[in-house]
A protein has these predicted regions:
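Aromatic- and Gly/Pro-rich amphipathic surface segment
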Residues: 36-71
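Catalytic domains of carbohydrate-active enzymes, especially glycoside hydrolases
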Residues: 65-86, 291-296, 359
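Generic alpha-helix structural propensity
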Residues: 61-68, 76, 85, 101-108, ...
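Glycine-rich, proline-tolerant flexible connector loops at the mouths of alpha/beta enzymes
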Residues: 85-98
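Active-site region of glycoside hydrolase catalytic domains
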Residues: 2-50, 93-95, 103-466
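Short secondary-structure transition/capping motifs
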Residues: 55-62, 95-99, 144
């Protein structure tokens, strides 16, 4: 007997869309006035590190094709869309002169999105620092904080008549981990002291942007986007539970608590103090963080954080790394995306929703990224279309968990998939495809995948049957 399908209907006004970023989609055109970013510089000196040596200069050519791409937003059922302004495009040197071509470009993009009846969210920073500032120490240098504050104010002044919903930073912990505790973001060094200072300076910059936004546009909403992941211990043994708690302090609460609550977790401060890793800060700066919390929260969720107690302690003279507090745990029998290697754990989204409800005042939030990267997706091409049923299933199964959380009072207002059109993903370039729309790298032709048409039906009916 065929099992009857269940209807998952979402609240009226629930928003459906996707997220992308400037550096991953726009590309560079000769004469566009864009300055080099940290990624442009890194690619120029070490292109072999990038998959198939594809760098940030071409990406998905949104700069040239934005009108057609925005029409595709409508065709795939978007009611909300998040993109980012590239700081080095708008202010090529990071400070000083504004690039008028960038102003024209972004105003036209924003106007076209709004004209389609799509709610627009604009992010100010998606890992792309003007290289001129990186040369002077980047986020280790407080001067970058003040430069970012000026950049944010410039954006609010130039585009505030079009944009009323803003993001300060996307996943700010990622450059900290990958650039200062690893080798996946420039400047590629392992320096715990620098990592902590970069994290603190980024949070201060975010709080200053919130302050500036509220002063210039009191009716606007501003947020930060965090890759929030609950930490799951290997076992209930005290040492594993402690490792999970510390992992969550570093990976999530280091930005979540100051952004939403205005304070740093006492245990995190204590750990940093004990390790002689406290950043340079002032009482006035802590007041800025305390008094300028976000209006809502953006949540990115891909996979769970599974950890276990550390197997080794720090030896004298060794650089301090997070492995002395917790180690990754590879859980046997987990469900895995075979095309990407990441664990798929849909209840993680439900756990995040309940955490926000119970510990963060049930703050309003959006899922700002959730998606499935697939290597070699052309293997699923049939009848001129990528038959990505696996992506549809991935989205459905996460939405079931979100629907459950909404039924229990979670304050989530929308779901934004990563991503719209297959985009450039940093060192991985185009290795893994995430889009509702396929991109042919040779011709730059866009073709809606099966999931794109399914997503439109999801949006139009505000729910699905499964």
């Amino acid at each position: 007997m065929k099992q009857r399908k269940h209807r998952y209907q979402f609240p009226d006004g629930f928003l459906w869309g996707s997220s992308t970023s400037g550096p991953q989609s726009e590309g560079t055109v000769p004469g566009d006035g864009k300055g080099p970013s940290n990624w442009d510089y890194w690619f120029s000196i070490e292109s072999a590190k990038f998959h198939h040596q594809i760098g940030p200069e071409k990406t998905s050519t949104f700069y040239e094709n934005y009108k057609g791409d925005i029409a595709l937003l409508k065709e795939t059922g978007h009611t909300i869309f998040r993109t980012s302004i590239q700081w080095p495009r708008l202010i090529p040197e990071g400070v000083g002169e504004v690039n008028p071509k960038a102003v024209t470009f972004y105003r036209e993009v924003f106007q076209d999105i709004i004209a389609q009846g799509i709610k627009l969210i604009v992010n100010l920073y998606h890992f792309d620092l003007p290289y001129a500032l990186q040369e002077k120490g980047g986020w280790e240098n407080k001067a970058t904080v003040w430069a970012y504050e000026t950049y944010a104010k410039t954006c609010f002044e130039l585009f505030g008549d079009l944009v009323n919903t803003w993001i300060t930073f996307n996943e700010p912990i990622v450059p900290v981990e990958c650039g200062y505790l690893g080798y996946y973001h420039y400047p590629c060094k392992v320096d715990a002291k620098a990592a902590v200072q970069v994290a603190y300076n980024t949070q201060l910059a975010s709080s200053l942007a919130v302050k500036a936004c509220h002063k210039l546009h009191p009716d606007h909403k501003i947020s930060i986007v965090l890759n929030m992941t609950s930490a799951y211990p290997r076992s209930n043994a005290p040492e594993d539970v402690k490792a999970a708690r510390i992992a969550e302090l570093f990976q999530t609460k280091s930005f979540l608590d100051p952004s939403v609550l205005g304070i740093y977790p006492a245990e995190l401060v204590s750990i940093l103090e004990e390790a002689d890793l406290l950043p340079q800060y002032s009482a006035d700066e802590l007041e800025i963080i305390k008094n300028n919390t976000v209006d809502f929260l953006g949540v990115n969720y891909y996979q769970p954080l599974r950890v276990q107690a550390p197997s080794k302690s720090q030896q004298e003279g060794d650089p301090l790394i997070l492995d002395i507090y917790f180690e990754p745990y590879d859980m046997p029998g987990k469900k895995v995306n075979p095309h990407r290697g990441w664990e798929i754990y849909e209840p993680g989204l439900y756990d995040i929703a309940l955490n926000l409800k119970e510990h963060y005042g049930n703050i309003e939030w959006l899922v700002t990224e959730n998606g499935m990267g697939v290597k070699g997706e052309e293997a699923f091409l049939a009848d001129g279309q990528i038959q990505d049923d696996y992506r549809i299933t991935f989205i459905e199964d996460h939405l079931i968990q979100l629907h459950k959380a909404l039924g229990e009072g979670a304050n989530c207002k929308g779901y934004l998939l990563w991503t719209f059109i297959d985009c450039w993903s940093w060192l991985n370039a185009y290795k893994n495809r995430y889009g509702l729309v396929a991109l042919d790298l040779e011709s730059q032709k866009r073709t809606i995948k099966k999931s794109g048409y399914w997503f439109k039906a999801l949006s139009e009916s505000n729910g699905f049957d499964k």
